[in-house]
Amino acid sequence: KSHFGGEYAVGSQHHSSLKYASMTDETLITVYAQETNAYPGVDMRRALSLISLPGIQKPLLIDLFRVSGQLGFIDLPTHYLGQFIETSVPLSAQAGTAPLGTNHGYQHIFEEATGRAQNADGLQFSWLASNRFYTMFRSTESGDSFTHGRLGANDPDFNLRRDPIFIHRRTPTTDQSTFVSIIDSHGEYSPVTELSTGQRSRIRDLKVTLDTPAYTVANIDLQSGDRFVVAWAHLDFAEDTIHEIQLPQGVLRWTGPQAVEAM
């Protein structure tokens, strides 16, 4: 279902609440906001960060999406441009091209392929756009489903661009669910030499290791063997607050609402 029931007039009466933003540290640029009006009884929080890690060519985009309350199913779409390369979740192509639904925008999306996560090992999804490679890593839960679709259904006058979309669906078993994603921009393809360089991401794995009402922690493992921990605070956003939590690899201690540490 669309935010605010798809009613523009209702949505115009509300705006998300900014919890914190930091733009001064070039190694960690971040913004965190909360939305409590889009769905009755549902609290949505989203944090977007650009972080720079040693050994990674360009800054990584880290996306935290956290939902709590009266939850049905959650669809988290990734709209992208370019050529699909591969995904770690096996997809089965659909014989026909039927719309995903009848309302709330689903009627305009063709269903091209579907798949389901068999475990919580996480998703990797790669594509090529403007001669550059992109890989998205996403935390998953067993039973999560995925749909690759394309805009353009029920569009007799061809007003919609036929852009691809990758939809991650989860039906939570509790009143809280968290998605953590990383998008890595890496390498390039030369149309002159027809050669690719750096087509594989230097990230090996992404896992959420702690998710409580107060904190979320994710591990980023690199191909080099290095590990970095990203932590978010959800209750206290003061810049001078000292946070301390126990992790399997040791104690993580930091100041402020978010941290990126090597561990």
Where are each of the predicted segments found?
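Polysaccharide-binding surfaces and accessory modules of carbohydrate-active proteins
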Residues: T78-S142
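Generic recognition of long tandem-repeat/solenoid scaffolds
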Residues: I29-E35, L61, A117, L123-W127, ...
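Catalytic and substrate-binding regions of extracellular carbohydrate-active enzymes
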Residues: K1-T97, D175, S185-E188
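Non-catalytic terminal regions with compositionally biased, polar/charged low complexity
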Residues: I167-S177, I183-M263
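Short, surface-exposed beta-strand/loop "edge" segments at domain boundaries and coil↔beta transitions
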Residues: N37-R45, Q70-D75, R116, N131-M136, ...
